[in-house]
């Protein structure tokens, strides 16, 4: 009949960015907490994505130590059976400013935010003990001019008892968006 035909409606994309401090100060238990948390949450995110007819959730991972480095070359669907969390290891200095500049490049319709069906505002998870060794403020200032960053949901997760919450709040824009993990 008239209503028997099914038409697949395009899904918009929501990109979750994990920006992970992999510097030497994150060695041991701290980086272990990060790996366990992300590995534990990905199956739940996958389930949410599969159950949502309107949005597909994709993830991007940006590690930063002495320099920032994308682990994922582009957003990866959490529904992709081949995608697995790759444990990160810690070592080096803390180039958060470099990570902010890399993130700024990715938050563009020319790169990571170019889905044909459109994109929801991204979600940014910064995971760090909050002790940058570079000029991170200039990187954050660049990000603050980016429209995707302005629209993004920003959460900073302070790892360890000594996490610098005020620095993490500079990234999110508010103290309320900083969560501590001990």
Predicted features along the sequence, with ranges:
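Acidic, polar low-complexity linker/tail segments
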Residues: 1-17, 22-32, 109-116
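DG-centered beta-turn motif at the end of beta-strands
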Residues: 18-23, 34, 61, 103, ...
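…and closely analogous acidic/polar surface helices at protein-protein or active-site interfaces
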Residues: 24-56
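Extracytoplasmic/secreted cell-surface and envelope-processing proteins
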Residues: 27-28, 132-138
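Arginine/glycine-rich "motif VI" loop of SF2 helicases in the C-terminal RecA-like domain
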Residues: 50, 144-152
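Short, charge-patterned binding micro-sites
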Residues: 56-83
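Von Willebrand factor
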Residues: 69, 81-120, 133-135, 153-166
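Von Willebrand factor A/integrin I-like adhesion domains
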Residues: 84, 161-182
């Amino acid at each position: 009949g008239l209503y028997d035909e099914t038409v697949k409606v395009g899904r918009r994309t929501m990109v979750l960015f994990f920006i992970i401090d992999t510097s030497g100060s994150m060695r041991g238990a701290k980086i272990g907490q990060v790996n366990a948390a992300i590995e534990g949450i990905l199956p739940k995110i996958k389930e949410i994505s599969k159950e949502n007819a309107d949005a597909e959730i994709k993830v991007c991972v940006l590690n930063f130590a002495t320099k920032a480095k994308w682990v994922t070359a582009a957003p990866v669907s959490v529904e992709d059976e081949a995608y697995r969390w790759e444990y990160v290891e810690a070592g080096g200095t803390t180039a958060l400013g470099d990570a902010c500049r890399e993130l700024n490049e990715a938050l563009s319709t020319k790169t990571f935010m170019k889905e044909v069906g459109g994109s929801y505002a991204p979600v940014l998870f910064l995971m760090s003990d909050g002790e940058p060794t570079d000029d991170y403020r200039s990187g954050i200032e660049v990000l603050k001019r980016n429209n995707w960053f302005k629209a993004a949901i920003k959460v900073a997760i302070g790892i360890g008892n000594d996490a610098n919450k005020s620095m993490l709040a500079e990234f999110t824009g508010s103290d309320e968006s900083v969560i501590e993990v001990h």
